[in-house]
Amino acid sequence: MNDRADGGEQSRRYGIREGAFQAIMLGGGENYLSAFALLLHASAFQIGLLSALPQLIGTWTQLLSVKALSWVRHRKSIILTGVAGQAFVWLPLLALPLIFPEQGPWLLIACAVAYVAMGHFAIPAWNSLLTDLVDPNRRGAYFGHRARVMTVSSFAALCAAGLILHSAEAWEQPWMGFAVIFLAASAARGVSAAYLARIDESSVPVTREDEFRLLAFLRREHGLNFRRFLLFSGLMHTCVLIAGPYFVVYMLRDLHFSYLEYSLWLAAGVIGQFVTLKPWGRLGDRYGNKKVVAATALLVPFLPMLYVLSANLHFLLAVNFLGGVIWAGLALGLQNYVFDAVRPEDRAKGVAIWNSVNAVGWFVGAMLGSVLAGVLPGEIAFAGLEVRPASNLP
């Protein structure tokens, strides 16, 4: 019994370390995919597609992963397949667009689809395994701590990658900077896979997934609440992603920010998450994740409005810091609500369905944003009054 408890504690530590190296990949690699697309002269439509299509297709692999959970004995085999595949995909993602620059943006989108799909393939099994390892009463604190560690790692990687890109830009060889940060992202995901391989799956009882029947799952106890939650989360992602993918276009192409200034803007959001993740986790444990979600969701609509007011770098840093604070609570609350709202044997299915709904909203919002960016006028005129917002795309 003590051996099992010790194994569980060690596995929880490995889960945090794995998250740290995963965050290095996200902060130092994935955060700069859109910037790489702009280097390849991607259009606004291609930027939107780069953001939305991988998420949409990735959810299909997540549903396949849920089905695979009933076929395999060990959840780690599914997790490691996805994570190792994700580490490998960084290599063609970097090389192919540089070898065939005429088709660079489309090749990048194709590789990004494979990259996200591999990551999504691991998510249901990972959530099922890690939540089994953590006591339900400590789940908010544990995942809050893990998210905090990931935020620090992501911030460090984001800043380091920004400095590397800035140096490469100064030498007029920006592609070399992207080569360095993407290869580092691949290596970090490889280390993440190594820590995942060391998690002792035998230290906790295996939660067997029931057969996946979508309608039956949604009709079960708490089904109505979960359907409302799915509708809310999907619509939230739709609205947010109307503008979300195009901030990089606005910053780098229209405001002519350097890679360093763009990195500072990204870093401000990460700092906002870092300083508030632990308090959000405690608030979720004390008052419930639903209240955390409700409080933060009410503030999200005001964030994009602030970008209309000024194009000053310091102002935009403050806005993104505030965005990091709000999104830290919303993201953590949404994740933990799913864990709490469904039965343990339905957890992987619940996560997969939730991510699928989010991805549909993500795709619809990003595509709608690409259309609006092309058809909306540059200034607003009404009753002889003309207004040109500071954030207008030319």
Q: Model-flagged regions — what are they?
A:
Residues 77-93, 186, 291-306:
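Structural signature of the two symmetry-related core transmembrane helices
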Residues 34-39, 67-71, 94-100, 154-176, ...:
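Transmembrane alpha-helix termini and helix-breaking/packing motifs in multi-pass membrane transporters
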Residues 60-74, 165, 275-288, 373:
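Helix-to-loop junctions at the C-terminal end of transmembrane segments
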Residues 1-60, 65, 69, 76-86, ...:
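Helix-loop boundary and gating motifs at the non-cytosolic
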Residues 93-112, 306-320:
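Helix-loop junctions at membrane interfaces in 12-TM secondary transporters
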Residues 1-14, 97-99, 103-109, 117, ...:
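Intracellular loop-helix junctions on the cytosolic face of multi-pass helical membrane proteins
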